[in-house]
Amino acid sequence: MAKRTVIIVGATGMVGREILAGLLADDSVGEVHSLGRRPPTMQHPKLTAHVVNFASQPLFPNLPQADEVYLALGTTIKVAGSQQAFRAIDYDANLAVARAAQAAGVTKLGLVSAMGADASSSVFYNRVKGELEEALEKMSFAGLVIARPSLLVGDREALGQPARRGEKLGLALSKVLSFLIPANYQPIAAAAVAKAILTAVPQAQGKNILLSGAMH
């Protein structure tokens, strides 16, 4: 059986790093091409890192022929600096990679979205996430997997990211009140999200949504 060629964007983020590790450990994957503003810290014979400026390379004309693409690129409005800058990364850059990947023959796509994603939401963050989901659905990939994790748990310090005050509070409360919190809204490990999406994408047919509770 021919080995799969995979494209990933956002491989230096919390979930993206776990997805990349899973792909590199998978014997059925022959090539992994990562796109990002900086290369992953991981090195592997089957990994090719492409450092890109998403603002100046919206079309990515040189992507290799591939089977799957994983979109794990994301930020926060605080880090991006404005709603416009946030949208440019979470919506524009992810969608540009999806289009380029489809042009390169990709038929299966996995997206790391968020609980609450809704194109009609009054919350800007949720609305952008929902708009991206809708845009990808319209592209008619043979298989589309959308993972909607709740509060992510992982080692931000290892990623060179500051700890987020809201996350610490959410984790503390969830430990005390876990019996009151629905499964879809309980914190989830980034590794669990990666494992779920890596399992679902290769066999996906049509649109599939993975809610946080189903990924634990």
Residue ranges, per PLM feature:
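N-terminal Rossmann NAD(P)H-binding glycine-rich loop of SDR-like oxidoreductase domains
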Residues: 3-28
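NAD(P)H-binding glycine-rich loop region in Rossmannoid oxidoreductase-like domains
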Residues: 6, 41, 47-96, 100-103, ...
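SDR active-site strand-loop-helix element
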Residues: 9, 35, 72-73, 109-115, ...
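Short, glycine/serine-rich, charged loops/turns that create anion-binding
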Residues: 13, 39, 77, 116
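Oxidoreductase cofactor-interface core, primarily capturing Rossmann-like NAD(P)-dependent enzymes
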Residues: 25-30, 45, 119-216
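Short, polar loop motifs at secondary-structure junctions
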Residues: 33-41
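Conserved Rossmann-fold NAD(P)-dependent oxidoreductase catalytic core, especially the SDR/UDP-sugar
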Residues: 83, 88-134, 138-147
